[in-house]
């Protein structure tokens, strides 16, 4: 398994997204218009000053995997939750269904509307620039989408797997997930 998955935000910002990384000492983050994610190199580092320098007043950032052992002065831990991280070892069987198309800059308005409705806060105005995104249109509307956002040199995250509520239960998300594996 890819060791970078133990500290995915930090790993992505040191590998495939190194050109985007805003880094200060032991902390790196995505620019806010891309994602609200930051990573720390080690749980033992003193990262309070670096976090403060890299974030705006009142801005929430999310860490995944490795986090500071102690909450830096001036910061508030609002939630600490477990997260299931799954690795697909073999491609899934793709079911028949509607056409899957690459989502490009011309689809940005539709993508932002769908993610605002069903996947708010984590998908930002420039998130699509982080990787490849694909979708299914039905009745002239973006019915479902999937993308690859984070990653390392060896792995990619499937992200923004979402379906418009009017199209739930039709297998669109499953089709997209299988197709992308």
Residues covered by each model-derived region:
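A conserved beta-strand-loop-helix scaffold within acyl/acetyltransferase catalytic domains
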Residues: 122-165
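A generic "binding-loop/recognition-motif" signal
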Residues: 67, 107, 154
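Generic beta-strand structural signal
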Residues: 82-84, 98-99, 132, 144
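Conserved acetyl-CoA-binding loop-helix of GNAT-fold acetyltransferases
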Residues: 46-51, 163, 169-181
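A short, internal acetyl-CoA/4′-phosphopantetheine-binding micro-motif in the GNAT/acyltransferase core
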Residues: 36-41, 161-169
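Short amphipathic alpha-helix that is part of the acyltransferase structural core
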Residues: 1-5, 89-121
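Acyl-donor-binding surface of acyltransferase catalytic domains
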Residues: 2-96
């Amino acid at each position: 398994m890819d060791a970078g998955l133990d500290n995915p935000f930090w790993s992505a910002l040191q590998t495939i997204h190194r050109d985007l990384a805003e880094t200060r000492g032991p902390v790196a983050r995505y620019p806010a218009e891309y994602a609200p994610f930051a990573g720390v190199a080690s749980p033992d580092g003193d990262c309070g000053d670096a976090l403060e320098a890299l974030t705006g007043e009142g801005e929430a950032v999310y860490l995944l995997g490795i986090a500071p052992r102690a909450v830096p002065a001036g910061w508030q831990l609002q939630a600490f939750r477990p997260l299931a991280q799954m690795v697909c070892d073999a491609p899934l069987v793709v079911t028949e269904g509607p056409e899957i198309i690459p989502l490009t800059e011309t689809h940005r308005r539709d993508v932002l509307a769908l993610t605002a409705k069903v996947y708010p806060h984590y998908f930002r105005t420039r998130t699509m620039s982080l990787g490849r995104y694909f979708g299914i249109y039905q009745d002239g509307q973006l019915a479902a989408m999937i993308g690859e956002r984070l990653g390392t040199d060896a792995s990619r995250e499937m992200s923004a797997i979402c379906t418009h509520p009017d199209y739930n239960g039709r297998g669109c998300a499953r089709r997209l997930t299988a197709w992308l594996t």
